[in-house]
Amino acid sequence: MKLNLKASGVARQLTTLAKTVAALSVLTACASSNTATVSSAMSKANGVFLESQTKITNGALHFDGKKLNHNTFEKPSLGPEYDYFFGKNISAHGDAVKPYKHYVFMTWYKGGKEQRNVMLSRFNTKTGVVKTIQFPHRHTGFRGNPLVGESHNTIGLAVSPKNGTIHMVYDMHAYVDDDESGRFKGRFVDDFFRYSFSVPGAADVPDDEFTLEKFVKDTSEVSQGTDDFKHLTMTGNLEDKDNFSALTYPKFYKSKEGELLHYMRWGGNNNGAYYFNKYDAEKQVWTRFTPFNHKDQETHGNAYNWGLYGQMKYINGKLRVGFQQRSANNNDRYKYQNGVYYAYSDHPDGLGDWKNVDGENMTWPLVDSDEIKIFEPGDYIDHQEPNSVHIVGGFDWTVTENEDLHFITHVRSTNTKRSDYKEVSIHAFKPANAKDFTVTTDFTGADSIYTSGDSIFIIGLKNGYPFVEKAKGGTNEFEVVYQQTSGVKFDHGTIHIENGKAYYYLMEKGAGNSLPLHLQVIDLGVSR
């Protein structure tokens, strides 16, 4: 594999926004209706349009206080403001929205600071009803302190097409059993993993029957009481509990055959592994976790330990992994991440037959990440001093149904005040029939990249309003095909794409730690 480089100091110019705008009425499940304005000429020409907008709640949790650090997190505010560690977002964040038949399911935490309950909403597109279940569990907070918000503690969500069960994994950040002398001070003994699931058919019940009673209580020896819906393992066997320790970032996927897969990160930022498991709908139980790569890589012969920042995805019938590496070597050029790495499995469940981007067999579980490295974004900045290159955020990847492979990443100088400061956004892509990657800096950057059909999309917010850019798979020829220009302004959101539609789950801009959530369904104009 070779890299074809197309560097450019000039970012691509976005397509001029359309000349004509028209107000579109928006469907809402609330008493008051909302209106959004989008470019009508742009939307009509590309077949991309806002299908509906629905308010899900008026009060979801958001962190509105000060960002704390390792020197200040033990002294959070005792007032109404909600201080936090890492980021402000916890609702409409992570793997929080999934369509199923004529329903859309969404997870969130209840606002404000004193509430924090795990919540599950179901929007019935036929009746227009949003029905919400409140769970007893409340957001744990950073290292078990509920006064410090923790943005990593997202709520992963899935619905099984095979039996209509609902699955949620939530509110954890590498928690383990420890004692008073440990990092978590014994706060997570027999409570370090949180899994909730429903009885079969719960996803399909009438609106008035969608209640907490459809979920299965924990009656095991580690149950925390009669209203405990949290299970310590996904296998139903407490002897497996060590397999469910120290995990973060739950994410579910569904195969074309309706099988559910799930993965999480085991370990920490610079010493971690991706673990995945599968749901057996007939037995109504999940398998134990299987590693994609080994943690503690030095003990397996590698020169250093490393962690993963990216995603495992199930696309086109294959389990795939794309990530950037965070090395435990703190004296190299990279302050945080480096590299672009990719692998896929030809086994339907990912249990072997793993290959690099060129189709060559790799070691499984992986130890030496260089076996699957594609290129080094840090090479686009020539700084050589330790920790001088900053790569955080702006990384994602996808594969079209034609097998066009795309990666995006962002790199800059760590010191923003240095005289030779550099900042570069990169798009690397390989069309399905091409042997080599094209790597271009003629790219304005993005946080995520998506696919539907043979097209790729960048979807996000501009001035608080959703926009969509589209390009043909295997190219860098993006154009703006949708831009909302008025209506509710949003702070952030998370996106799930399925059957040619983007389910954009959004938090409204506002003040305080209890803010509204909305669901926009955007038709991407993809034939299906």
UniProtKB/Swiss-Prot annotation:
PROSITE patterns, per database record: PROKAR_LIPOPROTEIN
Active site (record annotation): 152 (proton donor/acceptor)
Enzyme Commission no: 4.2.2.-
Chain residues carrying a lipid of type N-palmitoyl cysteine: 30
Compartments it resides in: Cell membrane
pH dependence, entry free text: Optimum pH is 8.
Record keyword Calcium present: yes
Superkingdom of origin: Bacteria
Keyword check for Lipoprotein: yes
Lipid group attachment sites (S-diacylglycerol cysteine): 30
Topology in the lipid bilayer: Lipid-anchor
Binding-site residues, substrate: 151-152, 309, 326, 390
Influence of temperature on activity: Optimum temperature is 50 degrees Celsius. Optimum temperature is 35 degrees Celsius.
Binding site for Ca(2+) 1: 218, 228, 230
Single GO MF annotation: metal ion binding
Site (Neutralizes the sugar carboxylate group at subsite +1): 265
Keywords: Calcium, Cell membrane, Lipoprotein, Lyase, Membrane, Metal-binding, Palmitate, Signal
Cleaved signal peptide residues: 1-29
GO CC term (a single one): plasma membrane
Residues annotated for Ca(2+) 2 binding in this entry: 329, 332, 334
Enzyme class: lyase
Task performed by this protein: Ulvan lyase involved in ulvan degradation. Ulvan is the main polysaccharide component of the Ulvales (green seaweed) cell wall. It is composed of disaccharide building blocks comprising 3-sulfated rhamnose (Rha3S) linked to D-glucuronic acid (GlcA), L-iduronic acid (IduA), or D-xylose (Xyl). Ulvan lyase catalyzes preferentially the endolytic cleavage of the glycosidic bond between Rha3S and the uronic acid GlcA, but not IduA, producing oligosaccharides that have unsaturated 4-deoxy-L-threo-hex-4-enopyranosiduronic acid (deltaUA) at the non-reducing end.
Family statement: Belongs to the polysaccharide lyase 24 family.
Protein name (Swiss-Prot/TrEMBL): Ulvan lyase, short isoform
Species this chain originates from: Pseudoalteromonas sp. (strain PLSV)
